[in-house]
Regions:
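Short, acidic/charged, Gly/Pro-enriched secondary-structure junctions
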Residues: 82-117, 121
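Short beta-strand and beta-hairpin "edge-sheet" elements
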Residues: 105-148
């Protein structure tokens, strides 16, 4: 019997395509300081296909899936994170100019990784409170279908 997994040790990583339209499998860098990853499990829309021959129940088929917009990663806003995000943004800009995408990996110990192509947004100011850790939200807009696959090397 398999044991349930803990979220301890999950890493958010990124890499750009070396070949356009091909998910990278190596060369991923870790984004330090990530505290929280939101749900990314979009439900499909439902399309009604009921016709006049149906006498009691409506019928539906699955439509498109919508991730609902940008994915917000809650992060500790410190120098190492800012350096990582700057590197990610610069790599994205360079790759984008060459027709290539940035890929995000959620590396989960004990199972396959979750990957998706994304467009990052520039950081703003995440706010502040008395006696609290300085945090921010780093936004990644999904730009393609996610996939479960073997963890990157």
């Amino acid at each position: 019997m398999a044991l349930e997994l803990s979220t301890a040790g999950i890493k958010v990583k990124w890499a750009v395509e070396t070949t356009a339209q091909t998910r990278p499998t190596t060369g991923f860098s870790t984004l330090r300081g990530v505290k929280s990853i939101p749900e990314f499990n979009p439900e499909p829309s439902t399309l009604e296909v009921t016709d006049l021959s149906d006498e009691e129940w409506k019928r539906y088929i699955a439509g498109l899936k919508d991730p609902g917009g940008a994915i917000g990663l809650t992060v500790n806003d410190f120098a190492d994170f800012r350096a990582d995000w700057t590197s990610l943004m610069e790599a994205y800009e360079t790759a984008s100019a060459d027709g290539k995408q940035l890929w995000i990996e959620y590396a989960i110990p004990g199972m396959d990784s979750y990957y998706y192509p994304a467009i990052p947004s520039a950081l703003g100011f995440g706010g502040a409170e008395v006696d609290a850790v300085l945090e921010n939200v780093a936004y990644l807009t999904p730009n393609g279908a996610p996939v479960w696959a073997t963890a990157s090397a």
